Amino acid sequence: MTAFWGEVIGTMLLIIFGAGVCAGVNLKKSLSFQSGWIVVVFGWGLGVAMAAYAVGGISGAHLNPALTIALAFVGDFPWKEVPVYIAAQMIGAIIGAVIIYLHYLPHWKSTDDPAAKLGVFSTGPSIPHTFANVLSEVIGTFVLVLGILAIGANQFTEGLNPLIVGFLIVAIGISLGGTTGYAINPARDLGPRIAHAFLPIPGKGSSNWKYAWVPVVGPILGGSFGGVFYNAAFKGHITSSFWIVSVILVVVLLGLYVYTKSHSAKTLSNSKYI
């Protein structure tokens, strides 16, 4: 099997486990209906671990465009392979989402809430706030990439690394995931969101495209900074990439902060005349 198909299958498995647990929690008449956030984060964490066990020896089990880009910045992955991996991850994520749709086929009609249906496929903020939502994804993915690189630098019992990474996902979900649903992976959010848009889900409502850029841009920025920060802080390698990524991150976050603040002020001003 090629690395391309390894990423397709690995990401498909990740979404089957992750979106599957979200479906079980969100959709009515599921035996795990309303079982809670802890179930969700453990489902995603174990899903990452199982997918990594399945294809780690084939593709390295990136399963995440933000991680692929971060590894390229670190120098552990060739830039020419980045588009191939990202394409594979997107394909796998869409396939995984379609499989979950089919698996829970009779449950869609039993669930009235369009937001609950969308929540099976993609993330959304608990409080819509552009700057804070992007920052949450930046921080979560920064911690993810930093953690993965640190785990990779340590010696564990052979075969234990994927499980440790799975628990890293759980830890991030418990501590940081409550704000945006912690996408921390552009393919994990965008692929299933695309599937949600074209699948014939009864009463599904909007795919919330106005938010879709947040779990793409945030993780890419956070993951990239996590990679160059690890090289600088842990290895002492401060390259031009570190400064480029740092400047882009600061400029984007400052721009979003100013935009969000001005938009909030305008909304408040308009509300006075209602």
Swiss-Prot record:
A motif (NPA 2) lies at residues 185-187. It comes from the Bacteria. Its main location: membrane. Pfam families: MIP. It catalyses: glycerol(in) = glycerol(out). The chain crosses the membrane at residues 3-23, 38-58, 82-102, 131-151, 164-184, 238-258. A motif (NPA 1) lies at residues 64-66. Gene3D superfamilies: Glycerol uptake facilitator protein (1.20.1080.10). Keywords: Cell membrane, Membrane, Transmembrane, Transmembrane helix, Transport. One of its GO terms (cellular component) is plasma membrane. It is a multi-pass membrane protein. GO terms for molecular function: glycerol channel activity. The keyword Transport applies. The keyword Transmembrane helix applies. GO terms for biological process: glycerol transmembrane transport. Induction: Requires glycerol 3-phosphate and the GlpP product; repressed by glucose. It is found in: Cell membrane. PANTHER family: AQUAPORIN OR AQUAGLYCEROPORIN RELATED, AQUAPORIN-9. Mediates glycerol diffusion across the cytoplasmic membrane via a pore-type mechanism. Belongs to the MIP/aquaporin (TC 1.A.8) family. Aquaporins contain two tandem repeats each containing three membrane-spanning domains and a pore-forming loop with the signature motif Asn-Pro-Ala (NPA). This is Glycerol uptake facilitator protein. It comes from Bacillus subtilis (strain 168). The gene is glpF.
